[in-house]
Amino acid sequence: QPIAPSIIEATHKAVEEMGHAETFHGYAPDLGYEFLRSAIAKEYKDRGCHVDIDEVFVSDGAKCDCGNIQEIFAADSVIAVCDPVYPVYVDSNVMAGRTGVYDPKTETWSNVIYMPCTQENNFTPALPEKTPDLIYLCYPNNPTGSVITKDELQKWVDYANEKGSVIIYDAAYEAYISEENIPHSIYECEGARTCAIELRSFSKNAGFTGMRLGFTVIPKELMCDGVALNPLWARRHGTKYNGAPYIIQRAGEAVYTPQGQAELKAQIDYYMNNAKMILTGLKSAGYSVSGGVNAPYIWLKTPDGMTSWQFFDYLLENVNIVGTPGSGFGPSGEGYFRLTA
């Protein structure tokens, strides 16, 4: 779907401002304009979450933050990831030299804790026995479309606080949540401000794939080995980043207006109706499927023992449908396939 009308209107207005000396904007503040950070903080407050303006770091997308956040942690930090998983979590740590030795037979890294999420455990990871320094969680989940209840998420928060781990919580798909007992933010959990960083995207809730905007929340209470992570990320952000463009941040501000919220809800309803049709159709055809209720992804078991890539080829050659082979998300993704609504 195209960008919502009220967001386009805000973008046009900001573009016009750039053509006049009295309203021209140059380099943006490193951490984001106050008008957008205030709107973001208010949205958290409306959900009962305590997030201050100076805990919000605006960027040009959640993917960049997913890849860059590891830079403020030690080179020998041990990471834990769900398996299957969004590849950026692992690959960015590989590039940082943090993941050890790769085993081509198992397609795993020696210094990464993998938490299998398969049909057998209802795509729900178990708390790691070995203590990780960083725990990557994504809910609603990419690629499986699974979700986590507040009670279950609280267990992760309690675990992280007990073990001294930091949770990197990717909430890019929170706008697709339709069920009441599913948290939209990890900060809905007691104690999360001392153990969790949250990542958000404007691409998933507002279609900013071609505009690029996202943000990261780091509470001031969050410490790692006695070092506060909020000012550390602020220093890193200011060193390597010049701020998201004024025009795009004004567009992002429009997302939080009543009109913007109404337009975006209609778009999300459109996608989720697609997901419902795909989910219903696949179930009636006898496929084993999950997701598609609180996320725009449908995760299905490949039929007849096909590998993920064999099923990809079959769909492309026989019915002209393109999806994503599950094996691309990690070893536990083999034998699965992701469709997008």
Residue ranges: model-predicted function:
Residues 20-24:
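Pre-Walker A segment
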Residues 1-18, 31, 35-341:
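PLP-dependent class I/II
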